[in-house]
């Protein structure tokens, strides 16, 4: 796995909070956000932001935001009724890795990033939310191209 360390600017988002096991909570969250954004003609990149470590937090308590990047300053009027709010991916130093997911196995690349790739490049997580940026749509095939992002600091 190749990791790049880059400084990212803050990215405004429309987000919908989900809670529970990631494999069960993210799909319905994305469906809801996609339906809402389609009604408003919104376009952007799809992301998931992860706030909890599944090695440390019980599955039912895991929190994530499904997100759509936006340049809009205003949340459409029905956003809050759908549980959608404005948010942001914080700017700062990130470790980025482009990975391919097969059979919807999202855990394996994350484990490799945290257990092998980050220690090897001399950086450690900085405590902020990690993210996935979806570069392809694998809903039908289980095959995904993703960018994984972890806020980091030098060891």
From Swiss-Prot:
The keyword Cytoplasm applies. InterPro entries: AraC_E-bd, DNA_gyrase_inhibitor, DNA_gyrase_inhibitor_GyrI, GyrI-like, Reg_factor_effector_dom_sf. Coiled coil: none annotated. The keyword Cytoplasm applies. One of its GO terms (molecular function) is DNA topoisomerase type II (double strand cut, ATP-hydrolyzing) inhibitor activity. Interacts with DNA gyrase. PANTHER family: DNA GYRASE INHIBITOR (PTHR40055:SF2), TRANSCRIPTIONAL REGULATOR YGIV-RELATED (PTHR40055). Belongs to the DNA gyrase inhibitor family. This is DNA gyrase inhibitor. It comes from Edwardsiella ictaluri (strain 93-146). The lineage of its organism: Bacteria, Pseudomonadati, Pseudomonadota, Gammaproteobacteria, Enterobacterales.
């Amino acid at each position: 796995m190749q990791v790049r360390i880059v400084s990212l600017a803050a990215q405004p988002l429309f987000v919908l909070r989900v809670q529970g096991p990631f494999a069960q909570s993210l799909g319905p969250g994305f469906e809801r956000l996609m339906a809402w954004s389609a009604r408003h003609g919104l376009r952007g990149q799809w992301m998931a932001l992860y706030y909890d470590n599944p090695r440390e937090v019980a599955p039912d308590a895991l929190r994530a935001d499904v997100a759509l990047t936006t340049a809009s300053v205003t949340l459409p009027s029905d956003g809050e009724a759908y549980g959608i709010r404005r948010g942001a991916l914080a700017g700062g130093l990130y470790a980025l890795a482009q990975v391919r997911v097969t059979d919807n196995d999202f855990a394996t690349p994350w484990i490799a990033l945290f257990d092998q790739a980050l220690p090897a490049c001399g950086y450690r997580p900085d405590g902020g939310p990690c993210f996935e940026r979806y570069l392809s749509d694998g809903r039908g095939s289980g095959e995904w191209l993703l960018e994984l992002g972890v806020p980091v600091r030098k060891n």
